[in-house]
Amino acid sequence: MFKSLAAVLPRASKAKFLQKNYASTLAFIESSKDGSVSRSSLSLLAAAQKLSNPITAVITGSKAEKTAEALKSSYSCSNLEKLVIFEDSKLDTCLPEQLTPLLVKLLKGGDYSHFVVSNSSVGKSVLPRVGALLDVQPVCEVTVIKDPKTFIRPIYAGNIISTIECQAEKKLLIIRASAFPPIAEGSMDSVTIEKRTDIPPCDLNVTWVKTILTKSERPELTSAQNVVTGGRALKDKETFEKLLSPLADVLHAAIGATRASVDNGLCDNSLQIGQTGKVVAPNLYIAIGVSGAVQHLAGMKDSKVIVAINNDPDAPIFNVADYGLQGDLYKIVPELTEKLGKYK
């Protein structure tokens, strides 16, 4: 086919160069209401670093430039090379119908081998749409990145750990933020910021009506360092609040709940932890009156220290707990709250 080895080498060298150039990652960064970088996005960048590719981060919304500057001046991500910002207030709501055309345009216009989002409500809404338009099957809830094409994720409520080798030209990943520590603090003077305004129109007739925010001084559930969770055993809404709130106040903790608690009207469904709720991995997780259904364990078993309080010695929650207190939670929890308050 080739007349000489000299003819082969230049072509091989060029092919290698093109392949290396193509290995790059696009990461979607979310910001908080004040323009700071969301904690899940900091973990997302930590995961993206494990792909060992140059990283381009895209930031949208009216505070995109503020978020970009905060990321550049306050954190360190070794592979991050460029921040692409689309500063427009119409993107503040993060409607997937508006974000999807923009992200698809970026992916088609750049040589990206990977596109990563966090497992936030925005990420979970956007990536399936992007995948459909690119005809690529996303890999969801990635907890381990072994190499640029091999990923590990839990399935069947965490009972099976699946290893996936993705052969797609563009790999779309939803990263479980709780599985990766956030990037370290520092600064990135060499990172460039590119401002763009070429936002493609949304073909769908979708309008954001209003935002209803639940005001709370407690930490956000998915990023809290300590979580206190109540189960079905708490019986009613008043008991749920009366027992859990003082303990959560002492520990500066977020409050969570099982699906049974939510279904029984003990609390709002925004507190639900588990397979059909939120996934948390705090430093301390206290389960009060939680039996330990498989679906609930899927959302909290990666917690660093798990404390279970239950009067049933055979409750499944004790199988994953680091510390267990068997007894009447109506006596144990107030006493624990009082002693922790004195220690504080």
Swiss-Prot record:
Transmembrane segments: none annotated. GO terms for cellular component: mitochondrial matrix; mitochondrion. Keywords: Electron transport, FAD, Flavoprotein, Mitochondrion, Transit peptide, Transport. Binds 1 FAD per dimer. GO terms for molecular function: electron transfer activity; flavin adenine dinucleotide binding. Coiled coil: none annotated. InterPro entries: DHS-like_NAD/FAD-binding_dom, ETF_a/b_N, ETF_a/FixB, ETF_alpha_N, ETF_asu_C, ETF_asu_C_CS, Rossmann-like_a/b/a_fold. FAD binds at residues 284-312. Its cofactor is FAD. GO terms for biological process: fatty acid beta-oxidation using acyl-CoA dehydrogenase. It is found in: Mitochondrion matrix. PROSITE patterns: ETF_ALPHA. The electron transfer flavoprotein serves as a specific electron acceptor for several dehydrogenases, including five acyl-CoA dehydrogenases, glutaryl-CoA and sarcosine dehydrogenase. It transfers the electrons to the main mitochondrial respiratory chain via ETF-ubiquinone oxidoreductase (ETF dehydrogenase). Heterodimer of an alpha and a beta subunit. Present with 2950 molecules/cell in log phase SD medium. Belongs to the ETF alpha-subunit/FixB family. This is Probable electron transfer flavoprotein subunit alpha, mitochondrial. It comes from Saccharomyces cerevisiae (strain ATCC 204508 / S288c) (Baker's yeast).
